[in-house]
């Protein structure tokens, strides 16, 4: 607590949920600090106005709700998708990629308002505390960060609910009148954790899924779409030009209706433990398939393979909170260079949780009908050349086999 005793004004990353509402009250009562709330409109939907009303009810005078949807998708989500980024083979990093943007705005507002510190609601067990703070320190090495979960005496959500009741802080309930799961949402994804999901053998109840219909309940008909790309980013859907945020929102709607993007996974947290979550990334699940498809005809083999080699490291940097690190920026420069000629159109069919590529075309294509045809290629490729190619590549293998045969 000693590092916070001189804090007079704090900028709080505020969602309006249980944790950050209690943190708001804690900052007021325990520190006697003036609190500025910052709520990022990341496309999470109906949480924004309730967050404003709750902050007003708790006496906050400076309430910042900032629409960052276009910035989020254009400057964070799309650069990540240029790399086909997946953490541990499955996770599209929907929570991870939002944290550096939130930290950026926290630092900016703290500078603007003359605040002594910023604060967040991430627990001491999770990744988000690392992501928020590494990003903040990368942008302002002298910033003071308050992380109440590491300082206060509360040990559980039950403790928080008891504190909320003592201070007349409204506690949200789910549709069944129970305390909700721990939920994070933005334009890219939604995640649900806690309660019954803490048992990795327990099947997630259907009501946990907030953004997608079950694949079993999706329509018994195919939805066909076309996505146009330029420099690795989607720019048009079914021939209509869309802004980055509008594009992702439209893909989300298509994914939602067709049961696409559900994921139940156990991941390795940066802090060392495993955690289980249920994630929904409907638009992102469509986008990554489409992006790989357009790369398949426009990206050189060597460049594509090198890019794939670096992708796990790039994904790990984002997951662990190093978005503003020099190594992430170095990799981003390489990735962006690779995307200069990644343009064209991909045709997809969406059906009951599946995303199927049915066509791809580009003015920058490297695909040659003349080279791959089973018919007469009119001299485009001399098959006799393959004999020397094989002979040279087999040289070391034959040498090794000859040695081993001698025994």
Swiss-Prot record:
One GO-annotated biological process of the protein:
argininosuccinate metabolic process
SUPFAM superfamilies assigned to the protein according to its UniProt record, in alphabetical order: Adenine nucleotide alpha hydrolases-like (SSF52402), Argininosuccinate synthetase, C-terminal domain (SSF69864)
The reply to whether Cytoplasm figures as a keyword in the UniProt entry is yes
Q: Which InterPro entries match?
A: Arginosuc_syn_C, Arginosuc_syn_N, Arginosuc_synth, Arginosuc_synth_CS, Arginosuc_synth_type_1_subfam, AS_cat/multimer_dom_body, Rossmann-like_a/b/a_fold
One family name in Pfam for this protein: Arginosuc_syn_C
Task: Supply the EC number(s).
Answer: 6.3.4.5
Q: Tell me what reaction this enzyme catalyses.
A: L-citrulline + L-aspartate + ATP = 2-(N(omega)-L-arginino)succinate + AMP + diphosphate + H(+)
Q: Which pathway does the database say it acts in?
A: Amino-acid biosynthesis; L-arginine biosynthesis; L-arginine from L-ornithine and carbamoyl phosphate: step 2/3
Query: What does UniProt give as GO cellular component?
Result: cytoplasm
Q: Which GO terms describe its molecular function?
A: argininosuccinate synthase activity; ATP binding
Q: What is its main location?
A: cytoplasm
Residues involved in L-citrulline binding: 91, 96, 127, 131, 182, 191, 267, 279
Q: Quaternary structure?
A: Homotetramer.
Q: Which family does it belong to?
A: Belongs to the argininosuccinate synthase family. Type 1 subfamily.
The protein in question is named: Argininosuccinate synthase
Source organism (scientific name): Mesorhizobium japonicum (strain LMG 29417 / CECT 9101 / MAFF 303099) (Mesorhizobium loti (strain MAFF 303099))
Q: Give the gene that encodes this protein.
A: argG
